[in-house]
Amino acid sequence: SVTTIREMAFYNCAYLQSITLPAGTESVGNNAFDTCTSLETIDFGGAKTIGQSVFYGCTSLKSVTISGECTEISVNGDGDTPFMDASALEEIIVTEGSGNYCTENGVLYNKDKTTLYAYPSAKKDKEFTLPSTVKEIAQSAFYHAVNLEKVDISGVETIGTYAFEECSALKSVKTTNTITSLGVDAFFNCTSLKSLRFGDKLTTIGSYAYGFYYNEDADPEND
């Protein structure tokens, strides 16, 4: 039976819409489903390790199911999880098991829910409140969450690089005086966000943590 899905194994399978890997699958290689543009659902079967950029170019992917025995979801060279590449993703499901991950309402966390790893980009909810256990928002966790307008991150201590980048609908972020670190580009290009409030525990602010690209030539007031 199949135990390994190698790198680029399903590369550019343009008509593949759904796939369920065997329960005996142990590992899935880097870019395994690269450019599967029609793929909407994937079940990783029993895979314990999932490689880098496995969803690169999977522009139709809506649902991902991961084994509860999974111990590693690899990040790429820039530190991003594979979910950053899935712009149509609505839910992530982790089955029961003794691995390192869990999900709640389609959102991916580590097992004890102290780190939020991935919020699906196309999740339909407009408001979201993090579980009180979460202390860290991982790199790119909310990247391009296009429907998210209001988020409550009370109790969080660390906000990773690119954490909320390109959340263009985001208008409100509720925080508490617990945040100590704000990563590079953390709220970059959140064009609907008018204000952010942090307490005096914040000691590190990464470059371009909030802001947006400004094109002077495109501003009618400067014509």
Regions found by a protein language model. Give the residues of each.
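A short acidic (Asp/Glu
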Residues: 76-77, 208
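Surface-exposed beta-strand edges and their flanking turn/coil or helix-capping segments
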Residues: 10, 77-79, 129-131, 142
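Beta-strand repeat architectures
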Residues: 56-57, 78-88
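Structural signature of tandem-repeat unit edges
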Residues: 1-4, 13-27, 36-49, 59-72, ...
